[in-house]
């Protein structure tokens, strides 16, 4: 059976009710929200993997607080055995699917194939990468994928593949596997993926490749100290600034958001950024036609001046004209509820950089 919503946490499952037959009309097992008296017909489907089994246990615990102690019924015991068996079987099946995908991806590229054959080969490889991305949203599968040397294949061959469709799917899969998993992040960093991803973000001709490369970079540096240190050594902040200056809206928004988050999480790098001229470049971006990404640019500026006198001094440089720009932007935003956070950043910058202790001219 197809399992809709199988990505991430699978099937919200609960144990079959204990023999007292009490029932909550909780959100719907497979079509019968009515009485639960008809034997085991209301039993939920067993989970397909260990993550689903864990979810089942959590759900059961939350739905039946402080159950009275009682012997486990034979029906309940049998159901649990079947659920555990199905979970392990489902995990094995998904590992086999990953192995099958890796066999496709490990094949050498057809050197002198005709156009139709090349297109079919690329389509098969793209399909394998997409299936892997779906499977690897489950952290157990992501770990198995890396143990099968899948990450070596992605970094070594597919980030630099000739077809853009292969490059962006490889970058997306790297990000999906790495997200919030320190051991996988360390493996990816050790393979030299960050340098290649920054190059894709900076130079690739395909916008989708650049957006997916940025996603993978974010997954490797936001909560990973070793990744951030590599990012600094590879001049990643300059690459990020150039991405914000592009005409691709999604790239601008995501780049500015990552910069803002890195500054909030790692204020110790503010001096480095100021010495790179980051204040001047961010102000220049705020002067461009108004866009949703300005919120994150102004948020980054706020992080550069909060409790940091060097950033305040640079914002006060008369040639920047930042005070006038901020006051004009406040007037523009006051009537727009959807820009409330951007307005607050403008007001904070005015207060921090341009208000003397006796100046209370911040009235809106």
From Swiss-Prot:
Biased composition (Gly residues): 23-42
Pfam families cross-referenced by the UniProt entry: Fes1
Residue positions, PTM Phosphoserine: 356, 361
Residues covered by region (Disordered): 1-75
ARM repeat spans: 137-179, 182-222, 225-264, 267-306
Keyword terms of this UniProt record: Phosphoprotein, Repeat
GO molecular function: adenyl-nucleotide exchange factor activity
Record GO cellular component, one term: endoplasmic reticulum
Function recorded in the entry: Inhibits HSPA1A chaperone activity by changing the conformation of the ATP-binding domain of HSPA1A and interfering with ATP binding. Interferes with ubiquitination mediated by STUB1 and inhibits chaperone-assisted degradation of target proteins.
Subunit structure: Interacts with the ATP-binding domain of HSPA1A. Detected in a ternary complex containing STUB1, HSPA1A and HSPBP1. Interacts with PGLYRP1; this interaction blocks the cytotoxic activity of the PGLYRP1-HSPA1A complex.
Name of the protein: Hsp70-binding protein 1
Lineage of origin: Eukaryota, Metazoa, Chordata, Craniata, Vertebrata
Gene: HSPBP1
């Amino acid at each position: 059976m197809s399992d809709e919503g199988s990505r991430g946490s699978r099937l919200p499952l609960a144990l079959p009710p204990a023999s007292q037959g009490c029932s909550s009309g909780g959100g719907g097992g497979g079509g019968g929200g009515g009485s639960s008296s008809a034997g085991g017909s209301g039993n939920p489907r067993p989970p397909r993997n260990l993550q689903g089994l864990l979810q089942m246990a959590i759900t059961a615990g939350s739905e039946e607080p402080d159950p009275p102690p009682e012997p486990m019924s034979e029906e309940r015991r049998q159901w649990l055995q079947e659920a555990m068996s199905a979970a392990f079987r489902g995990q094995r099946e998904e590992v086999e699917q990953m192995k099958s995908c890796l066999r496709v991806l490990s094949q050498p590229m057809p050197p002198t194939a005709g156009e139709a054959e090349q297109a079919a080969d690329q389509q098969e490889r793209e399909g394998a990468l997409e299936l892997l991305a779906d499977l690897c949203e489950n952290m157990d599968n992501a770990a198995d994928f890396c143990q099968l040397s899948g990450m070596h294949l992605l970094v070594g061959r597919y980030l630099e593949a000739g077809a853009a469709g292969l490059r962006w799917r490889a970058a997306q899969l790297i990000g999906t596997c790495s997200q919030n998993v320190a051991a996988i992040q360390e493996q990816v960093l050790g393979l030299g993926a960050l340098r290649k991803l920054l190059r894709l973000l900076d130079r690739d001709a395909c916008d989708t490749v650049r957006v997916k490369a940025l996603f993978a970079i974010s997954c490797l540096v936001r909560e990973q100290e070793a990744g951030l240190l590599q990012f600094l050594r590879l001049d990643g902040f300059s690459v990020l600034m150039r991405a914000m200056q592009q005409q691709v809206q999604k790239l601008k928004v995501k780049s500015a958001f990552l910069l803002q988050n890195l500054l909030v999480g790692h204020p110790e790098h503010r001096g480095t950024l100021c010495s790179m001229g980051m204040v001047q470049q961010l102000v220049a971006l705020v002067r461009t036609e108004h866009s949703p990404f300005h919120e994150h640019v102004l948020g980054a500026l706020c992080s550069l001046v909060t409790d940091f006198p060097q950033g305040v001094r640079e914002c006060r440089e008369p040639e920047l004209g930042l005070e006038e720009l901020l006051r004009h932007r406040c007037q523009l935003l006051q009537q727009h509820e959807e820009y409330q956070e951007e307005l607050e950043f403008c007001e904070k910058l005015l207060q921090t950089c341009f208000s003397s202790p006796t100046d209370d001219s911040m009235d809106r």
